[in-house]
């Protein structure tokens, strides 16, 4: 029997409907598969802080700075973080009393399944000057005690200050990576000083090719794109990234520059332009690392990198491979955690 127009339309509609159902099923399967990847991928936090005892209220936000170890771990349980690197805050620009490496080692020994120690040395200690580098053996000593990173380096000195150069040299000799915080300018709270465009950092990347620099802070992440004002340099530039900045340029040129996406600075650098974030993370997938930087035990002060990375993966901006590398695999490789 010949095909009538009515039968043709009916069969065509059925075919279209079937294709649509198959398409929705495929999308659902894909979404379910991504949810399963997210559920089984535990983050490793490259940038954490905590303290044994409560510290005086911070004069910036007026709140208690730094969580206690159990508070930090409770946030990890909530966010799906397996473990984190506890960074020292030994520079006097940070907090009253600082944070000795011995304290970090003690905390991490008590929570060895969740917390990883770092070493913090102020570049101004030990009579350090241009011809007297005493840091190499110290970093090696702490390395052998289990410290995996040097930092967070927040001294308000220029990258090219001789004291800072000796610190970099000693860290490189010990084979430890270094987490640094860039300041907007001299006297602006804390952080290493550099000019817009990070010219001093570039010289250090050249001078210390075996030292892995883990970059962080507002004045670092603002360089993912371009900006015009000092307020943007010390804050959080917003909007689409139409012209790339110095960070991607430096990363293409120097394989020893890495990115730590912690704090509001790293998270907002990704959220301001999801399309560019996907391209950036994909291009530099082996040198970008998840971090949170919980600096106060209150939820409203905690950035949401875990949500951002999951969003980028679920919505197709990054692949599963990129997601897993940034979430944990790069940290495992660079810190020798396997």
What are the residue ranges of the model-derived segments?
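Active-site environment of divalent metal-dependent phosphoester hydrolases
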Residues: 51-54, 91-94, 124-126, 157-159, ...
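Short aromatic-enriched loop/helix-cap "lid" or pocket-rim segments at secondary-structure transitions
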Residues: 55-58, 97-98, 130, 164, ...
């Amino acid at each position: 029997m010949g095909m009538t127009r009515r039968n043709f339309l009916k069969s065509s509609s059925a075919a279209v409907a079937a294709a649509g159902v198959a398409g929705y099923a495929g999308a659902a399967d894909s979404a379910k598969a991504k949810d399963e990847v997210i559920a089984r991928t535990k983050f490793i936090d490259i940038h954490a802080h905590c303290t044994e005892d409560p510290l005086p209220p911070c004069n910036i936000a007026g709140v208690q700075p730094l969580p206690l170890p159990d508070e930090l771990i409770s946030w990890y349980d909530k966010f799906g973080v397996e473990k984190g690197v506890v960074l020292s805050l030994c520079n006097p620009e940070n907090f009253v009393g600082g944070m000795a490496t011995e304290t970090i080692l003690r905390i991490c020994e008590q929570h060895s399944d969740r917390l990883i120690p770092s070493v913090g040395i102020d570049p101004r200690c030990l009579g350090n000057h241009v011809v007297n580098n005493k840091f190499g053996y110290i970093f090696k000593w702490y390395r052998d005690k289990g410290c995996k990173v040097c930092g967070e380096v927040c001294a308000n000195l220029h990258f090219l200050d001789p004291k800072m150069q000796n610190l970099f040299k000693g860290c490189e000799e010990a084979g430890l990576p270094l987490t640094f915080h860039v300041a907007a300018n001299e006297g602006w709270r804390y952080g290493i000083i550099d000019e817009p465009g990070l010219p001093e950092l570039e010289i250090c990347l050249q001078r210390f090719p075996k030292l892995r620099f883990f970059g962080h802070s507002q004045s670092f992440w603002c360089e993912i794109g371009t900006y015009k004002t000092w307020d943007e340099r010390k804050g959080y530039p917003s909007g689409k990234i139409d012209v790339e900045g110095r960070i991607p340029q430096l990363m293409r040129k120097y394989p020893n520059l890495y990115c730590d996406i912690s704090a509001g600075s790293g998270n907002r650098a990704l959220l301001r332009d999801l399309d560019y974030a996907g391209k950036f993370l994909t291009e530099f997938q082996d040198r970008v690392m998840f971090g949170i930087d919980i600096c106060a035990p209150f939820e409203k002060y905690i950035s949401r990198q875990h949500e951002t990375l999951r969003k980028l993966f679920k919505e197709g901006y990054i692949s599963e491979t990129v997601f897993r590398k940034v979430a944990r695999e790069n940290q495992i490789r660079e810190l020798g955690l396997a």
